[in-house]
C-alpha cells in the first residue's frame, strides 16, 4: 500500500507540473500536495513533496520526489480532516483569491471556511494546534462535507485555499479545472 500513495502523489505532481501556468495558483508560502494512508496517525503516514512545490517560469516545480513524512502543515490538515471524513485522504493548498472561491462554488463544490481571528489563544499558543482547529471549525461551519476549505489569513498568516479529495490525482484534476476557469476569468485563454 505504501507504494500506492507515493505513486499517486508522483502522478498528481506530474499533472500539475505539466499544466501551463499552474504557477498562478501557488501561494507565497508555496504549495504541497499530500496523500495519507488509511487511518493516518502522524506526518510519517502522509506522502508529500519535500521542500514544497514552487513556481518556476509560470509552472509548478518540485525539487524532489514525494515521500512519507515530508510535510508537517499539510499532513496535519489531512490527518484532521481524515478523522471526520475517512474517504478524504488527499489535499493541495493553493493561493487565496475571492474569484477562486466563486469558481469553486460555481462548479458545485462544497466550500467552507474558518476565521483565524477567532482562534483561541490556547490553540494559537500550542505548536501545531492551529490547523486541526481550523479544520474542525470549517467542518462545523458546513452542512455537507467540504471539498474546499479556506481562510482569509491573520497577522503573519497568508490566506489559503485547500482542495480535498479521495486521492492526489483527483485533487490535481480538480486544481487543473479550477486553473482553466481562473485563467479564462483573468482573460488568459492559453
From Swiss-Prot:
The enzyme's E.C. designation: 2.5.1.3
Main function: Condenses 4-methyl-5-(beta-hydroxyethyl)thiazole monophosphate (THZ-P) and 4-amino-5-hydroxymethyl pyrimidine pyrophosphate (HMP-PP) to form thiamine monophosphate (TMP).
Source taxonomy: Archaea, Methanobacteriati, Methanobacteriota, Methanomada group, Methanobacteria
Pathway(s) served: Cofactor biosynthesis; thiamine diphosphate biosynthesis; thiamine phosphate from 4-amino-2-methyl-5-diphosphomethylpyrimidine and 4-methyl-5-(2-phosphoethyl)-thiazole: step 1/1
Catalytic activity reported: 2-[(2R,5Z)-2-carboxy-4-methylthiazol-5(2H)-ylidene]ethyl phosphate + 4-amino-2-methyl-5-(diphosphooxymethyl)pyrimidine + 2 H(+) = thiamine phosphate + CO2 + diphosphate; 2-(2-carboxy-4-methylthiazol-5-yl)ethyl phosphate + 4-amino-2-methyl-5-(diphosphooxymethyl)pyrimidine + 2 H(+) = thiamine phosphate + CO2 + diphosphate; 4-methyl-5-(2-phosphooxyethyl)-thiazole + 4-amino-2-methyl-5-(diphosphooxymethyl)pyrimidine + H(+) = thiamine phosphate + diphosphate
Biological source species: Methanothermobacter thermautotrophicus (strain ATCC 29096 / DSM 1053 / JCM 10044 / NBRC 100330 / Delta H) (Methanobacterium thermoautotrophicum)
Record InterPro entries: Aldolase_II/adducin_N_sf, ThiN
One BP annotation, GO: thiamine diphosphate biosynthetic process
Family listed: Belongs to the ThiN family.
Protein name in the entry: Thiamine-phosphate synthase ThiN
GO molecular function annotation: thiamine-phosphate diphosphorylase activity
Alphabetical UniProt keywords: Thiamine biosynthesis, Transferase
Amino acid at each position: 500500500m505504501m507504494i500506492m500513495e507515493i505513486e499517486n502523489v508522483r502522478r498528481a505532481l506530474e499533472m500539475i507540473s505539466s499544466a501551463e501556468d499552474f504557477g498562478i495558483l501557488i501561494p507565497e508560502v508555496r504549495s504541497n500536495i499530500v496523500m495519507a494512508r488509511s487511518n493516518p496517525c502522524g506526518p510519517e503516514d502522509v506522502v508529500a513533496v519535500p521542500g514544497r512545490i514552487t513556481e518556476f517560469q509560470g509552472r509548478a516545480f518540485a525539487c524532489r520526489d514525494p515521500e512519507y513524512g515530508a510535510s508537517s502543515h499539510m499532513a496535519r490538515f489531512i490527518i484532521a480532516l481524515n478523522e471526520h471524513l475517512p474517504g478524504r485522504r488527499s489535499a493541495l493548498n493553493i493561493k487565496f483569491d475571492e474569484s477562486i472561491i466563486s469558481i469553486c462554488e460555481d462548479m458545485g463544490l462544497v466550500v467552507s471556511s474558518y476565521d483565524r481571528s477567532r482562534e483561541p489563544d490556547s490553540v494559537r499558543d500550542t505548536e501545531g494546534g492551529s490547523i486541526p482547529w481550523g479544520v474542525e471549525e470549517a467542518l462545523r461551519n458546513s452542512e455537507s462535507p467540504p471539498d474546499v476549505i479556506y481562510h482569509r489569513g491573520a497577522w503573519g498568516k497568508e490566506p489559503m485555499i485547500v482542495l480535498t479529495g479521495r486521492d492526489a490525482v483527483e485533487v490535481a484534476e480538480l486544481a487543473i479545472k479550477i486553473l482553466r476557469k481562473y485563467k479564462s476569468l483573468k482573460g488568459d485563454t492559453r
